[in-house]
Amino acid sequence: MNLIPTVIEQTSRGERAYDIYSRLLKDRIIMLGSAIDDNVANSIVSQLLFLDAQDPEKDIFLYINSPGGSISAGMAIYDTMNFVKADVQTIGMGMAASMGSFLLTAGANGKRFALPNAEIMIHQPLGGAQGQATEIEIAARHILKIKERMNTIMAEKTGQPYEVIARDTDRDNFMTAQEAKDYGLIDDIIVNKSGLKG
């Protein structure tokens, strides 16, 4: 059962009730707190586009606590983060794994953060195939192309050589916030909101 808290705000026109995510959106905060699938991606993309249309000069804050998920859904979020004019600050908390860590690293340069006890896990894309041998071969070639593209992006965002990224993502690679900072996945570790930019 997924309960969504409601907050009540006093306005000049009386009380107004919001679900917590709508209230956070007023402060330009987006929460990615689940596995990434098409529905989650569509929601995140819509919020990014809305906030950018509202004010492209103000930063957007994307908080990430996600085990990862669909590559295509995650890439829709990644592309939209780059598409919008507003800088997207990313804040990792809890666990940012797989596509979650990829999106954490995709934040605006100098504006990628993690909370002190966050864990970050990188690895290569996962995929499965069944069917005839030729279909399995096509799927394998496809996942290898995705792996190459994601490793290239990670190398650009972290400053690590491509070969290092390829080696380090060969298996599940868990990092503390400090290790992720040293690696270049994030820019800084913050303990409160005053550590955010802008």
Curated annotation (Swiss-Prot):
Q: Which reaction does it catalyse?
A: Hydrolysis of proteins to small peptides in the presence of ATP and magnesium. alpha-casein is the usual test substrate. In the absence of ATP, only oligopeptides shorter than five residues are hydrolyzed (such as succinyl-Leu-Tyr-|-NHMec, and Leu-Tyr-Leu-|-Tyr-Trp, in which cleavage of the -Tyr-|-Leu- and -Tyr-|-Trp bonds also occurs)
EC id: 3.4.21.92
- The active site consists of S98, H123
Q: Which InterPro entries match?
A: ClpP (IPR001907), ClpP/crotonase-like_dom_sf (IPR029045), ClpP/TepA (IPR023562), ClpP_His_AS (IPR033135), ClpP_Ser_AS (IPR018215)
Q: Which one of the record's GO molecular function terms can you name?
A: ATPase binding
Q: What domain of life does the UniProt record list for this protein's source?
A: Bacteria
GO cellular component, alphabetical, reads:
cytoplasm; endopeptidase Clp complex
Q: Which UniProt keywords apply?
A: Cytoplasm, Hydrolase, Protease, Serine protease
Q: Give the UniProt subcellular location, in the record's own words.
A: Cytoplasm
Could you tell me which cysteines form disulfide bridges?
none
Q: Name one GO biological process term.
A: protein quality control for misfolded or incompletely synthesized proteins
Q: What class of enzyme is it?
A: hydrolase
UniProt-listed Pfam families: CLP_protease
| Function according to Swiss-Prot or TrEMBL | Cleaves peptides in various proteins in a process that requires ATP hydrolysis. Has a chymotrypsin-like activity. Plays a major role in the degradation of misfolded proteins.
Q: Which family does it belong to?
A: Belongs to the peptidase S14 family.
HAMAP family with a match to the protein in the record: ClpP
User: How is this protein organized at the quaternary level?
Assistant: Fourteen ClpP subunits assemble into 2 heptameric rings which stack back to back to give a disk-like structure with a central cavity, resembling the structure of eukaryotic proteasomes.
Q: What is this protein called?
A: ATP-dependent Clp protease proteolytic subunit
Whose protein is this, by species?
Listeria innocua serovar 6a (strain ATCC BAA-680 / CLIP 11262)
